Amino acid sequence: MCIRDRVYPGHHGGLNWGGVMVDPKHGLLLVNNQRLPYMQSLVSREKLDALGAKSFQEAPGQSKGFRVQQGQAYGATKGPWMSVLDQPCIAPPWGYISGIDLRTREVIWSRPFGTGYDNGPMGIPSRTQWEIGTPSDGTGVATAGGVTIIGAALDQFIRAFDSQTGELLWQQRLPAGNQAAPLTYIANGRQYVVAVVGGHDRIPTRLGDSIMAWALPQK
């Protein structure tokens, strides 16, 4: 027995996992958010056993896509609702970054977040920087100077946006994904940004083991 249903937003959010960034000086909340549907199925114990489904405790790292629910008559499978081309079954954008006015609670800007540079039909990277809007995992940092700095998207870029308008100010390609929030600080009168560039195996972004730093010009 198998009962299927679609979930939208999917299990990965809305705005789950990454959290939000707050700019109290300008009264803004910044958030990267998903538009990715999931398909989940209620599956009988017999079929789960036939599929070789294991819980995380039984097989760490091998439970992706299964909700085993040991001791129950049913478990579940779940995952993004994908086409035969290995692309989501709805049109892009699949992810946005948005600015919200905390006083009025209105979305003052929103734009697709992430390109298809490392993604495409059948898993073939498109190598284009068209902002299709990808799912993302991770958050960023909003500075007092009105800049939001964030990696998180599937295309291995880190970006800086104008927090008040959403204008893209800067971006740089990374050797792996940045799924952890960047850190910013000032030392000797100069502002720095530091990010862990380690990737994530379940997004997936490219894995790495780097810590990278950037600084504003001294003048």
Regions found by a protein language model. Name each.
Residues 26, 35, 94, 154-155, ...:
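Surface-exposed loop/turn positions within WD40 beta-propeller blades
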